[in-house]
Amino acid sequence: LHVSFKKPSEEICTFFNIDPEKGTKCMVLERVRGNKEYPFVSFISYFNPNIPLTGDEDFTQPLYGVLENKYNIIVKTSKEEVSARLAGEFIAEKLDIKSSDPILIRKRFVYDINQVPIEYNIGYYRADSFTYTIEAER
């Protein structure tokens, strides 16, 4: 678990509707899920800079519970994109795989009950541990 404050990319600035020229920083939460022998996903979450996060929150607790209990932010909607690519050195090191191994990338765009963007989350999944299931009804 690693918490920092970083200037977001232009794509993330657009999502949060912030001016990239102002140098606004977002709180960034990075964590790897799985265990030491088999890490299967690396998450990087950027949070709306209008949320007064300090980085001292207890992120061992459920994230959306922290947002609701401490900041009265109720998460309602998420939209997702899934794509594939090779891991590259940075992600390969986190997931204990080769840089040439395939990974799946899931971008999740999270909104509160008022459709205010709350979290921009990127998940990098080992391709050998990810199944994406969709159910549709007419």
Protein language model regions, located:
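All-alpha effector-binding/dimerization core of bacterial HTH-type transcriptional repressors
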Residues: 1-138
